[in-house]
């Protein structure tokens, strides 16, 4: 009796400390059963389902006495309230006893094993067995009774012991002797805590978590599940599609860059034609080789760059830059001319006649060409007048360079003249009246082709002489003199190109070749006496 009162009092104190639970909820959910004092139990359930009616009635009687004694000790309880409470509790105990008496007895198969209550989780392929509904709530399901072995109890006790809170005592019920003894264990969680725990366990059981998604796949929007292998394939397809889009974007950008470059080349070619670069050629435009066409476009680009460098040189001289800064511009001009010599050397290996005939130059420039370029000695004569004042040592160096250039030019001219004579003799060998039917016609053409191949060697030697002359002149002059030298060369050829443009666009009424009758000497005399500026008054 004393043990029951002590247990009832401790249970009431713990219940008041945690949460005030009404008596009907205590009957619905019961108290928490334990297999041993050190083992934490599952969510609480009604232990009256498996207790005799007499034991239940005795328990409620002891509970009433404990409440009455506790209230008398405090001296704050109204006797009328005690009688009403006792009457209501007696009625509840009688109703519970009648409900238990009406149920059939439960067969105990293993009476020596302890029994604990465990909440059964609902899965897709499992069926709920032995569940009953509570009269207070139709949505709550009573937990099922499950027989467990001592080994399973010991295994689950370690996990449940981590959830215990020290300092709290609950009632422990065993099925062996129906004795009630206090023990230290975790307090009974509330209904909300049980619902949260059940929801968390269901999420873990039914595919919750990233690990299960990676292992078992995921669910699409249409509700169909996708396994992990399909997920990997879909991810690989998305990555391949992304890389394909990047390659396509780069390809489109390449095409756009090429289109812009082609438009620029066409504009440069049109500008070169407007400046008279292709006037009076020895061949039609359709007969021009691909290498020659490429050289013409590159030469037009070179002229544009040359005009920019001439502007920089003129600005540097007018601003009186330091020799260091001005020397950088001079070196760029020297490298720019070296680039032109490289372009000509590449074209000489494929089409040397395009260079020798001067088709790439304007008509006025073509008049002063010597073996496909400028004559070094003539250029030195022009520059000496533009480089004053010169020191005596510089004058000696320039005159020495001029003499060596003239000697090299004479040697190349003699060699080229001999080649022309030899080539003419080869072509004129045999009888010219017989035509292609001559027996040795093909052999003569083969010999002539070998001699024509020597033209490339002569042109390369002439270009090397021009390039070496510029480099030697750069070493003789100072930085400012070299800047004036390159500025004078560029301005000289710019004036020749301008002269060609003026000649190609001269007024047509000044042409004499259209006259049907040639004028006599007396008629030509007044024409020579006319002032020359009247012929180009429009310019």
Swiss-Prot record:
Where found in the cell? Answer: Nucleus
Keyword annotations from UniProtKB, A to Z? DNA-binding, Nucleus, Plant defense, Transcription, Transcription regulation
Bias class Polar residues marks the residues at: 115-125
Quick one: where's region Basic motif?
Answer: 229-249
Q: Which residues form the DOG1 domain?
A: 292-506
Keyword DNA-binding applies: yes
Where is the stretch described as Disordered? Answer: 115-140, 181-246, 513-539
This protein's record includes keyword Thylakoid = no
Compositionally biased region (Basic and acidic residues): 219-242
SUPFAM superfamilies recorded: Leucine zipper domain
Q: Which domain of life is it from?
A: Eukaryota
Q: Which GO terms describe its biological process?
A: defense response; DNA-templated transcription; positive regulation of DNA-templated transcription
Chain ranges of the bZIP domain: 227-271
Pfam families hit by this protein: bZIP_1 (PF00170), DOG1 (PF14144)
Quaternary state and partners of this protein?
Interacts with NPR1/NH1 and NPR3/NH3.
What's this protein's family per the entry?
Answer: Belongs to the bZIP family.
Q: Its function?
A: Transcriptional regulator involved in defense response. Acts as a transcriptional activator in vitro.
Protein known as: Transcription factor LG2
Q: Which organism is it from?
A: Oryza sativa subsp. japonica
What is the gene called? LG2
């Amino acid at each position: 009796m004393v043990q029951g009162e002590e247990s009832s009092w401790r249970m009431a104190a713990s219940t008041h400390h945690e949460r005030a639970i009404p008596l009907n909820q205590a009957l619905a959910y019961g108290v928490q059963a334990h297999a041993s004092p050190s083992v934490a139990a599952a969510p609480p359930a009604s232990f009256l389902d498996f207790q005799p009616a007499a034991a239940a009635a005795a328990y409620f009687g002891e509970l009433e006495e404990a409440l009455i004694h506790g209230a008398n000790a405090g001296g704050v309880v109204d006797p009328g309230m005690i009688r009403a409470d006792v009457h209501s509790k007696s009625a509840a105990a009688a109703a519970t006893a009648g409900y238990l008496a009406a149920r059939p007895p439960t067969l105990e198969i293993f009476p020596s094993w302890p029994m604990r209550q465990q909440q059964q989780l609902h899965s897709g392929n499992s069926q709920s067995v032995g569940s009953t509904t509570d009269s207070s709530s139709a949505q709550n399901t009573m937990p099922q009774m499950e027989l467990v072995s001592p080994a399973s109890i010991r295994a689950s006790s370690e996990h449940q012991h981590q959830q215990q809170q020290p300092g709290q005592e609950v009632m422990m019920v065993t099925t062996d002797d129906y004795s009630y003894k206090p023990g230290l264990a975790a307090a009974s969680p509330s209904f909300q805590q049980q619902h949260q725990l059940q929801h968390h366990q269901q999420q873990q059981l039914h595919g919750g978590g990233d690990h299960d998604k990676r292992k078992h796949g995921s669910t699409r929007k249409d509700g169909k599940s996708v396994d992990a292998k399909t997920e990997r394939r879909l991810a690989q397809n998305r990555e391949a599609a992304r890389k394909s889009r990047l390659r396509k974007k780069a390809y489109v950008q390449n095409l756009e860059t090429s289109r812009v470059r082609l438009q620029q080349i066409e504009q440069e070619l049109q500008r070169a034609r407007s400046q008279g670069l292709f006037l009076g050629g020895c061949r039609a435009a359709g007969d021009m080789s691909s290498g020659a066409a490429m050289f013409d476009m590159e030469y037009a680009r070179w002229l544009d760059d040359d005009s920019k460098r001439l502007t920089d040189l003129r600005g540097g001289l007018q601003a009186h830059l330091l020799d260091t800064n001005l020397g950088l511009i001079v070196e760029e001009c020297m490298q720019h001319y070296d680039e032109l010599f490289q372009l000509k050397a590449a074209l000489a290996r494929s089409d040397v006649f395009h260079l020798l005939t001067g088709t790439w130059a304007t008509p006025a420039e073509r008049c002063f060409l010597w073996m496909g370029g400028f004559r070094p000695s003539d250029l030195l004569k022009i520059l000496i007048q533009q480089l004053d004042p010169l020191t005596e040592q510089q004058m000696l160096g320039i005159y020495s360079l001029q003499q060596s250039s003239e000697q090299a030019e004479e040697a190349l001219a003699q060699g080229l003249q001999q080649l022309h004579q030899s080539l003419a003799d080869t072509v004129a060998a045999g009888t010219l009246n017989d035509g292609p039917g001559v027996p040795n016609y093909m052999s003569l053409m083969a010999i002539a082709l070998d001699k024509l191949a020597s033209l490339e060697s002569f042109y390369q030697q002439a270009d090397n002489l021009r390039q070496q002359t510029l480099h030697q002149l750069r070493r003789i002059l100072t930085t400012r003199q070299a800047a004036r030298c390159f500025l004078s060369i560029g301005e000289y050829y710019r004036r020749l190109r301008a002269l060609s443009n003026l000649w190609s666009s001269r007024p047509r009424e000044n042409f004499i070749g259209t006259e049907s009758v040639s004028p006599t000497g007396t008629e030509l005399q007044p024409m020579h006496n006319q002032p020359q500026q009247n012929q180009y008054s429009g310019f």
